[in-house]
Amino acid sequence: MYSTPAPPEVTRRNSEPSTRQGTLGSLQGEKGQIIFPGFVVLLTIILVIIAACILWSWKKQKKRPVPYFQVAPSLTLPPPRHRAKNIYDFLPRQQTELGRHQLSGFSTESLLSRASDSPEPEAPQANGSLQMHRVSVHTVEYSVNIYDNGTVPQMCRHLASSTHHVCVRTSRSNPSISSKESNDYVNIPTVEDTCETLTRIESTPENHLGLPSALRLEFAEGGHAGCGNATDHDGFWAPGPKCSDSLSDGDDLSQTSNDYVNMTGLDLENIQENRPRGAFQCCRDYENVPWVDTNESQLPTLEEVASSTVDHREPVWRTLSSVYHMAFQPSAQSEDSAMVHREEQSSEDSSDYETVLVAELEGRDWKQGPGTQHPSDEGTPGDLAGKLCEVVYPAGSLATETSDEDA
């Protein structure tokens, strides 16, 4: 059972192929181990190069110059350039301080004050026995509220049913009066309308009564003895419930406005009258006046008013039971003028205690103020006879007197 050994040549041939296989396997294993670390090293080198490039580019951008101007410290700033001149440098010093033009406001007071600086025109001498007297009203500022109460009766001879005529003479330098606080339209009638109105007033009968629907303040320009001549008159109309026929078509605009007209800041320094007119007496409005016994206190009151208002050039402002009380001294008349005494009328049913007083002073010569000539110096002592028509209305009503004109 024993085998014989193989010859040595055969043994060598069989061992050579196994050795070759072992060498090839070892070489492949070593080759794989060498490639992996090389790949890792190559990847690390690439990453380092990329990081270095990023850092280099960042430093390069940081060293790049800034495009905007760098602000230096305030101590090293150069002096500023001279700017353009202000447009207000050429203005006066006062306006330069204000920084703008000072606008001057337009007001009625400024116009009246400018007109008052102008010299007063000389009025012509009167042809009658009474010398012309000049009455100047000096007021600083006051307000006149005119109300139209349709239920209050009145007693005056020359007052028509459509207009309440108040004649106040003023100089030509004040042709118009405006009201800043009023929303009314002021319409000035023509000369023809004024003449027609005066003609209708003179032709009105004595027993014609009733409160007017429109109140007219007529400012004459001086130079004529009476109010009958309307050639130089300027009309100032305050609106009422109804308008007179003498109003023009444009006067309808005042129908839609309020029932009162405020005249504030009226300067009447240049008011001229050809004869003494009397005094203005006023006090607070919207208060009731109790009824008084007119038989005992009427005549003394009228005599006191007549004596106190004629002795002064300036009108006397007096307080009478908290109502607007305005009395005008009558104009001069001839010796043959008729004296009429009218009855007083009082409305006790009214809540406002209206009292209408009418009185006539017969055979009384009016004393003249200082610097004037007494009427008896030029004519007979009985040349002048006056009448005083005194009307008291509540809450801002006006009481005026109108006298008869020579036919």
Swiss-Prot record:
One of its GO terms (molecular function) is SH2 domain binding. The chain crosses the membrane at residues 34-54. Its main location: membrane. Residues 55-407 are cytoplasmic. One of its GO terms (cellular component) is cytosol. It is a single-pass type III membrane protein. Disruption phenotype: Mice are viable, fertile and healthy, and show normal lymphocyte development. However, their T- and B-cells are hyperresponsive to stimulation via TCR or BCR. Residues 1-33 are extracellular. Keywords: Adaptive immunity, Cell membrane, Immunity, Membrane, Phosphoprotein, Signal-anchor, Transmembrane, Transmembrane helix. It is found in: Cell membrane. Induction: Up-regulated in T- and B-cells following TCR and BCR engagement, respectively. Residues 16-25 have a biased composition (Polar residues). GO terms for biological process: adaptive immune response; antigen receptor-mediated signaling pathway; B cell activation; intracellular signal transduction; lymphocyte activation; negative regulation of MAPK cascade; negative regulation of T cell activation. The modification Phosphotyrosine is found at Y185, Y260, Y286, Y353. Phosphorylated on tyrosines upon TCR or BCR activation; which leads to the recruitment of GRB2, PIK3R1 and GRAP2. Residues 1-25, 109-131, 331-388 are annotated as: Disordered. Negatively regulates TCR (T-cell antigen receptor)-mediated signaling in T-cells and BCR (B-cell antigen receptor)-mediated signaling in B-cells. When phosphorylated, interacts with GRB2, PIK3R1 and GRAP2. This is Lymphocyte transmembrane adapter 1. The gene is Lax1.
